[in-house]
Amino acid sequence: MKRISGVLFFLFLWAGFLHAQTLLTNELNKLISSDPLLKTSEVCIVVHDLTAGKELYSYQADKLYRPASIEKVVTAVTALDVLGKDFQFQTTLSYDGVVEKGILKGNLYVKGGFDPEFMELDMDFLVRAVKEAGIQAISGKLVGDVSLMDSIYWGEGWSWDDTPEAFQPYLSPLMLNRGCVDIKVSPAAKGKAGTVEITPESDYYQLNNRSISLHPEAGKLKITRDWLTNGNTIDVSGCVSSVRKRTLNLYDSKRFFMDTFCYKLNKEGLSVSKDSIFFLTAPDSTQWIYTCRRPVEEVLKRALKESDNLSAEALFRQLGQMNGKHTSHISFGDCQVVIGRFMRNAIGHDPKEYRIVDGSGVSLYNYVSPRLILAYLNYAYRHPSVFQTFYDCLPVAGVDGTLQGRMRTGKAFRNVRAKTGTVTGISSLAGYLTSVNGHKISFVIINQNVLKARQARKLQDKICELLIQLN
């Protein structure tokens, strides 16, 4: 009798599940057929009940789409599993030769570990470490070791005209201030040139200030650089009527790092010639001075919450070292090998059926299916060593990151944790939510061929609200 009762109870639960799934299917189908956005564009959706272990809904889930930044889900989950949550990015200072009477008779080395969070304060610590080592002058070379990666500073399929935007820096194992400068322009007295402040301070870039304060006839304020010629002259022109800020990338991040390091050393009273800067591989026998360490979680948080491309590419390059062949001069191809191996062995998908060429989703050559992205979300959920860090780093609806301005009301508020994605023609969302019945749900939504991302985001938010109502 007890066995029969158990079977009946199971059948009752299963019937309830099927009923809820049918209701969800009907509601989503109705939304897809009625939304005017989908008359001129496409959408693909896949939804999975992690608690019940069942797929709830799919629509074009096996078709290939450009993922935009939800590809960072692939990079982040792979990095947490392969590198581990205790991994650290390292920038190391060392020397060879001897220090006699304050003079380093040898070379000073900075070995880059692709730390995307290395800022001006970190460089100040490098300068202090040199001084504390008793070095007042260098008779040899000031060496930047960027041997971690090859010389290709942009990914395959990146748009050349995205430069000089900050979201597309020139990649290097030595990155200072994310390869960018922060510019602040303020009005001065009427008719006078605006006040321009640029950080970090360096002699690597120049300023051409042609702005005029409080003078509308001067035209719209423009802040740019001579990027078409790979120049690093910051050009400010037009009318300055209020405080304006902009962040621009600089050409050749490794040179920006080393030139600024040399500049700061000299500013602190050390004697170092700019002509002594070289880019070589540091020998294993150098004497250690200092190491700047960055936890992987700090990099993951910016990659996911802020959808930061540099952070994702830094993770991608570190994964490339796990290619099993070599740990230096890492190429995008080396990184793709590791991504593909993990996809096959851990996720259970054939990498030959997809195309992933970078770590950030910037490339227009990336093609994945929604079901593939869902498989990474589900894998993370099943592995506690990956999930908690990954989940904590995702944007929270209405609260922070790229979801701060979305889903600020309703049941989705503070419930949805998901990675957003936006490139021209693409808007995507992938993550987790908890339905009213307490079940944890994973989902992926990709809108393709959309001219106005705002309309796609509105549809995605509606879908999230529908999923939360699942009972």
Language model: regions and residue ranges:
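Bacterial Sec-dependent N-terminal signal peptides
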Residues: 1-23
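Short Pro/Gly-enriched beta-strand edge/turn motifs at strand-loop
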Residues: 27-29, 203-212, 410-417
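Conserved serine DD-peptidase/penicillin-binding transpeptidase domain
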Residues: 34, 82-351, 469-470
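Small-residue-rich helix-loop
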Residues: 56-58, 306, 316-471
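Short active-site loop at a secondary-structure junction
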Residues: 58-78, 82
